Amino acid sequence: MLIFAAEMDKLHIFNPEHDIALASNLTNFTAPHAGRQLRADLGFLPALWADEGDYVLVEDADYAALAYRRATKGRKCRVEWVTKSQLSSLSLLSVSPWGWDSALRHQLLRYGVDASLLPSEQQVAEIRQLSHRQTAALLLPSLRIGGTVGEAVFCQSVAAVEQQLSLHPRLVLKAPWSSSGRGLRFINGQLSEYHLGWLRNLLTSQGGVMAEPYYDKVKDFGMEFITDADGTIRYEGLSLFHTVNGAYVGNILATESAKLEMISRYISVDLLNIIKQRIISSLRLGTYQGPFGIDMMIVRNNPQLSTKSSQLLLHPCVEINLRRTMGHVALSLSPADDDIQKVMRIDYTDNYKLKIRKL
């Protein structure tokens, strides 16, 4: 296999175990089996958005090439597949992973990637701190305008959680760092012994827990962004996705105008545009540069609120994912024709596969 270093200067990495690695905060982190298999089976994903001639790190180059062809129905591959044994011999100008964490940084150093291409330990620590759910909680007040809902409180004791329960009998507790669908507990009225054990463990391991009122969710969706080196935030597009028990299932592939039409059946497009502009002007992400996504949801109005009971409200910042998301993947596959609409799913039988079907 011939590699022309002068033409290929960016290395892309799909490390879906990133969220769990952030929570562990270990340099010698070992991902759970499901995370390792997801990375092995879908390591080709960066080829969907990489530039021609870029490298994509995979475990098996032949398997990645085959999986890419199957997923894209024969779309021409423009990248070079590489394995970890080749990294020390590559001439690179930049590295672009799914998300930065301490474990990935140390892996790449062990594989021979130049430290100057990687964020410093201090920068990785900053990314981890910004990935704390408090970042979303701090952004929320600047997004709370008419037609919106949402609050979150960081609790550092059982008593603080019980105080929130006295205000909101139905509560959602969230680990400060966790992957989709994990680290969530739904509390109805009081803390059980099971919940107390989970909570005390979390208070010890992560220093606290996020407490949020339970909302009657109608629809999940998100907005995808990229932040540049100078801190400028650019909007990339809407992400209309589906979850089951908090875990990602699939994304709609459609033009931005088609997605706006779909979401306008629930809430005002003008409201969405205002929220988008407030995110761009209000969110501060330090030295982080790269893709990120903000999960949102449409909820039925809580009868305790002083608004019409039939009203649908926007929760504008459920979570901030300071990494690439499946929404970004969907944007890289979205059609240019308003009449073409598909759905992208991650299916699992004996392995993970990216499937694209007509909607």
Regions found by a protein language model. Give the residues of each.
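ATP-grasp fold ATP-binding core
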Residues: C155, L165-F186, G207-K217, I294, ...
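N-terminal "leader" segments that precede or initiate the main folded domain
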Residues: F4-L66
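ATP-dependent carboxylate/phosphate-activation module, predominantly the ATP-grasp catalytic core
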Residues: F225-R278, N321-D347
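Phosphate-binding site of ATP-dependent enzymes
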Residues: P169, Y194-A247, M297-N301, S310-C317, ...
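Glycine-rich phosphate-binding loop of ATP-grasp-fold ATP-dependent ligases
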Residues: E151-A152, L171-H195, G222, N245-M262
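A long amphipathic alpha-helix within ATP-dependent nucleotide-binding catalytic cores
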Residues: Q206-G208, Y235, G246-L313, Y352-L359
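Short, basic, low-complexity termini and linkers enriched in Ser/Thr/Gly/Pro
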Residues: M1-A6, L87-L92, N302-L312
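Conserved N-proximal alpha/beta basic substrate-recognition cap immediately N-terminal to
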Residues: I3, R36-L45, L57-A160
